[in-house]
């Protein structure tokens, strides 16, 4: 059996001139079924059979490895895309959280101002001071700005 000393992708398995066995390319060797391979191996020496089977196994393993590499790269790209998407979602939620904290702080301040005002009203008539008047005005203005619904009414 003679082969090319420099193997290439389309290496042909050549038989000695006296034999009738057909020439098999790498693609043919890999793609044929076991039954077809066994038919081609009939009449070959044990050494040639072993060499062809080893070559077929090597080529198939090479194909499996290439397939695995492609799958791994594809999965890596998909995971990277998901990571970027989730990172953007985390950033968006952090912005929403920050905004809601600011809103909560503003509502807490209004609530505390209303409580203070309610305590001063509950104590009875007081002489208006500049601080108390400012507090009431602030409360009234902030209530008008923040609420488009009906403000507090006396008639219930």
Curated annotation (Swiss-Prot):
Region spans: Leucine-zipper: 79-93
GO biological process: regulation of transcription by RNA polymerase II
Xref: InterPro entries: bZIP, bZIP_Maf, bZIP_sf, TF_DNA-bd_sf, Transcription_factor_Maf_fam
Subcellular location: Nucleus
Spans annotated as Basic motif: 51-76
Domain called bZIP: residue spans: 51-114
GO MF term set: DNA-binding transcription factor activity; DNA-binding transcription factor activity, RNA polymerase II-specific; RNA polymerase II cis-regulatory region sequence-specific DNA binding; sequence-specific DNA binding; transcription cis-regulatory region binding
A cellular component term, taken from the record's GO annotations: nucleus
Residue span of region Disordered: 1-21
SUPFAM superfamilies, alphabetized: A DNA-binding domain in eukaryotic transcription factors, Leucine zipper domain
Domain of life, source organism: Eukaryota
Chief location of this protein within or outside the cell: nucleus
Coiled coil: none
UniProt KW keywords: DNA-binding, Nucleus, Repressor, Transcription, Transcription regulation
Cited function: Since they lack a putative transactivation domain, the small Mafs behave as transcriptional repressors when they dimerize among themselves. However, they act as transcriptional activators by dimerizing with other (usually larger) basic-zipper proteins and recruiting them to specific DNA-binding sites. Small Maf proteins heterodimerize with Fos and may act as competitive repressors of the NF-E2 transcription factor.
Assigned protein family: Belongs to the bZIP family. Maf subfamily.
Assembly information from the UniProt record: Homodimer or heterodimer.
Name the record gives this protein: Transcription factor MafK
Organism lineage string: Eukaryota, Metazoa, Chordata, Craniata, Vertebrata
